[in-house]
């Protein structure tokens, strides 16, 4: 009888802890998987690079905006405030360091599906990515944040790294009443860099002359396939939806 009592008590405590952890994660929701920002509650967009793919889907689906800046790390220092000043629109920035064309295209599609009122996408297109396979994707995307499957959300709710870094920093922001991270600062590394002619020349090495690579039919087909599937297709789909 005592063993049964201890078993039931252990199960009860375990369930209570799991429910409490779930409630905290859903309420704070550092990656905006369940909801957008809550008015009066500051949030922190932590770091850049590896963390971007965790934040971006929630930003695209649950923030209120009219325009989006997206692309690879080349767009990380783009300033959302400049877009807002030029076109008088609410702007978010969702960059994917090393992102492939298909990865970014899939992100834009999910974002537009959740925000029909978006009027402008400013998208960086890296020339070298056009040479990749049109279906190239990153090796470790957090798919559990991209879909609507509640069962695989255990990977988010009970993720140790999520508790130790983004959730902890969000709680700190709330406690200390910091201002939320702006989309000028999110992903940006420019404040940590020094820009000058002297700095550039100190790291410059003149490249050796090389023969110009031949523009083959294989290269042409790769570029065309990328453009058709990961750029132009979305434009045609959007135009058809507007008609």
Feature map (PLM): residue ranges:
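Secreted/periplasmic serine-hydrolase-like ester/acetyl group-modifying domain
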Residues: 125, 134, 138-235
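Membrane/wall-proximal cationic-aromatic binding patches
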Residues: 30-93, 99-110
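Short secondary-structure boundary micro-motifs
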Residues: 8-9, 42-43, 51-53, 198, ...
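Generic preference for well-ordered secondary structure
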Residues: 39, 91-95, 203, 207, ...
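Hydrophobic membrane-insertion alpha-helices, especially the h-region
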Residues: 10-26
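Membrane-embedded segments
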Residues: 74-152
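Conserved small/polar residues in nucleotide/adenosyl-binding loops
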Residues: 236-243
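N-terminal Lys/Arg-rich, disordered targeting/topogenic segments
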Residues: 1-5
């Amino acid at each position: 009888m005592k063993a049964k009592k201890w078993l039931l008590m252990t199960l009860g405590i375990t369930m209570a802890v799991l429910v409490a952890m779930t409630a905290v994660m859903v309420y704070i929701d550092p990656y905006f998987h369940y909801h957008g920002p809550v008015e009066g509650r500051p949030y922190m967009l932590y770091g850049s690079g590896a963390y971007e793919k965790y934040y971006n889907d929630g930003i695209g689906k649950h923030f209120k905006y009219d325009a989006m800046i997206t692309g690879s790390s080349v767009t990380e220092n783009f300033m959302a405030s400049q877009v807002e000043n030029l076109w008088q629109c609410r702007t978010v920035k969702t960059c994917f360091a090393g992102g492939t064309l298909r990865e970014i295209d899939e992100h834009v599609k999910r974002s537009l599906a959740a925000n029909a009122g978006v009027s402008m996408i400013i998208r960086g297109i890296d020339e070298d990515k056009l040479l990749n396979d049109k279906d190239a994707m990153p090796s470790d995307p957090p798919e559990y944040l991209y879909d609507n499957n509640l069962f695989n959300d255990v990977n988010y709710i009970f993720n140790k790294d999520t508790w130790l870094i983004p959730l902890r920093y969000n709680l700190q922001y709330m406690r200390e009443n910091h201002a939320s991270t702006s989309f000028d600062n999110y992903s940006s590394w420019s404040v940590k860099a020094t820009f000058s002619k002297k700095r550039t020349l100190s790291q410059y090495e003149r490249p050796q002359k090389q023969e110009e690579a031949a523009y083959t039919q294989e290269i042409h087909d790769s570029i065309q396939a990328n453009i058709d599937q990961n750029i132009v297709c979305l434009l045609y789909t959007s135009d058809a939806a507007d008609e």
